[in-house]
Amino acid sequence: MKTKIITLLLVGVLASSCVQIKNDMSNNFDHAFAHTVYFWFKNPDNAADKAKFEASLKKFLNNSEYAKTKYIGTPPNAVRDVVDDSFTYSLILSFESAEAQEAYQSEEAHLIFIEECQDLWEKVIVYDSQGI
């Protein structure tokens, strides 16, 4: 009996902590404006290019006063035909407003990142969206 009660308590604590983690993640993502960027490198397998890009991008994101959520990703090993895994890096940022995203475009940290890394990519596609 005692073991069942302890087990139920542990399951309850674990379940409530998982809900809290989900809520924290949801609260950190500002739903007002999302900015998704895909980069295709000229030399996607070049380790030095990747290291340069990652260092510059992390420096930029640490110094951006406008970007809220900051996610950097690489393509997964896609197994479904509908998944485009042709890009080298993805970047997902959220902003409190379209105006904040516009200000981010001209902030110094963003411009320095572009200057440092624009020679690495051959293609960039941006998808912006406003929350509903």
Task: Describe these PLM feature segments.
Residues 5-13:
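Sec-dependent N-terminal signal peptides
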Residues 14-16, 109:
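Hydrophobic alpha-helical membrane context
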Residues 89-132:
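Surface-exposed, polar helix/loop patches in the mature regions of secreted/periplasmic/lumenal proteins
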Residues 18-68, 72-88, 96-102, 130-132:
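Short S/T/G/P-rich N-terminal loop/turn motif that feeds into the first structured element of a domain
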